[in-house]
C-alpha cells in the first residue's frame, strides 16, 4: 500500500491533486499533522487502503527530524511517497489575484510576494526529499489530474519510472527535471521549409535526423551515461527519474531524441513514460 504525502507551495494545486488521488481510490486527508501519520496508516493497514495526505506550511513540523521520525513509525505494509507540487512565482501571484484568497502566511503581515518566498524556504526540506516534483505553471486543473493518473496508475510498485520529456529552451527549463540535456547543437529541421510545420514524431523529420551521425552519437552517449548510473539510482529509493531533453522550440530535435531514448529503455524492460511539453501546449 502507498502513503502518498502531497506537499507544495500554496496555489500550486494540492487540492486538485488530492481530489484526483481520491478518484483513484486513495483515502485522502487534508492537512493532517505529521505526528498523526503513523496512526492513520495503522488504522488503514487492516483495510488494505492506500492513503494520501496533504502537508503544507500550516502543518509543517518544527524540524525535519519530526518528519523523518514519523516515516520510521509507519507500518511495514505502507510505502511512503512524497509528491511536491510547485509553480513559478508569477503564476502563483496570478492565481492568488484571480481567486482573491489570502495566502496562509499573510497573517504575519507579509506581502503576497514575501509570503510566497518565505513559504518556499519553509517547504524546502520536503521539496528536497520529494520522489516526484511537478511544475503546474502551464497546467490546467484537468491536465494535472490526468498527469497524476498517468504517472501513478502507470507505475509498477517499487520500480523506478523513467520519464523522458522534451521541451523548448525559449519556454524555460522544466523544474521537475533530474537531468537536462541540451540538443540545440544538432542539425535543425526547422530550416527546411517542408519540415518546419512537422514535429519530431513525423516520419520525414525522423528520417532527416536519422541521417546525421552526430545525432546517433549523442543518443548513444546519453543512454550510456544513464545506463551507467541507473543501477545506483534504482537502489536510491526513488520512484521517478525525469530526463529533460531541450532544443530551441521543443518541436523537432528534443522530441525525436526523447522518443529514441524512451524506446531504448522501454525495450529493455524499464518502466518508461514520455512527454512533450511544447506539443502538449499546441493541443
From Swiss-Prot:
Coiled coil: none annotated. Keywords: ATP-binding, GTP-binding, Nucleotide-binding, RNA-binding. GTP binds at residues 56-59. ATP binds at residues 8-15. Residues 266-283 are annotated as: RNA-binding. It comes from the Bacteria. One of its GO terms (molecular function) is RNA binding. The keyword Nucleotide-binding applies. Modulates the synthesis of GlmS, by affecting the processing and stability of the regulatory small RNA GlmZ. When glucosamine-6-phosphate (GlcN6P) concentrations are high in the cell, RapZ binds GlmZ and targets it to cleavage by RNase E. Consequently, GlmZ is inactivated and unable to activate GlmS synthesis. Under low GlcN6P concentrations, RapZ is sequestered and inactivated by an other regulatory small RNA, GlmY, preventing GlmZ degradation and leading to synthesis of GlmS. HAMAP family: RapZ_like. Homotrimer. Belongs to the RapZ-like family. RapZ subfamily. This is RNase adapter protein RapZ. The gene is rapZ.
Amino acid at each position: 500500500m502507498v502513503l502518498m504525502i502531497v506537499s507544495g507551495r500554496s496555489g500550486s494545486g494540492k487540492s486538485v491533486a488530492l481530489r484526483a488521488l481520491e478518484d483513484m481510490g486513495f483515502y485522502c486527508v487534508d492537512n493532517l499533522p505529521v505526528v498523526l501519520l503513523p496512526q492513520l496508516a495503522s488504522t488503514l493497514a487492516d483495510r488494505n487502503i492506500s492513503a494520501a495526505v496533504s502537508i503544507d506550511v500550516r502543518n509543517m513540523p518544527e524540524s525535519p527530524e519530526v518528519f523523518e521520525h514519523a516515516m520510521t513509525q509507519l507500518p511495514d505494509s505502507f510505502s511512503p511517497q512524497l509528491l511536491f507540487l510547485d509553480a513559478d512565482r508569477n503564476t502563483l501571484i496570478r492565481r492568488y489575484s484571480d481567486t482573491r484568497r489570502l495566502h496562509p502566511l499573510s497573517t504575519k503581515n507579509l506581502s503576497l510576494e514575501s509570503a510566497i518566498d518565505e513559504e518556499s524556504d519553509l517547504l524546502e526540506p520536503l521539496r528536497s526529499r520529494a520522489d516526484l516534483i511537478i511544475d503546474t505553471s502551464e497546467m490546467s486543473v484537468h491536465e494535472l489530474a490526468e498527469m497524476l493518473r498517468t504517472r501513478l496508475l502507470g507505475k509498477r510498485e517499487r520500480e523506478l519510472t523513467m520519464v523522458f520529456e522534451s521541451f523548448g529552451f525559449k519556454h524555460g527549463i522544466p523544474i521537475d527535471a533530474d537531468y537536462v540535456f541540451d540538443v540545440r547543437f544538432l542539425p535543425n529541421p526547422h530550416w527546411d521549409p517542408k519540415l518546419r510545420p512537422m514535429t519530431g514524431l513525423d516520419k520525414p523529420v525522423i528520417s532527416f535526423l536519422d541521417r546525421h551521425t552526430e545525432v546517433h552519437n549523442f543518443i548513444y552517449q546519453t543512454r550510456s551515461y544513464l545506463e551507467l548510473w541507473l543501477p545506483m539510482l534504482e537502489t536510491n529509493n526513488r520512484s521517478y527519474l525525469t530526463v529533460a531533453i531541450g532544443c530551441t522550440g521543443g518541436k523537432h530535435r528534443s522530441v525525436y531524441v526523447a522518443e529514441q531514448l524512451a524506446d531504448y529503455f522501454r525495450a529493455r524492460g524499464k518502466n518508461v513514460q514520455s512527454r512533450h511539453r511544447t506539443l502538449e501546449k499546441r493541443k
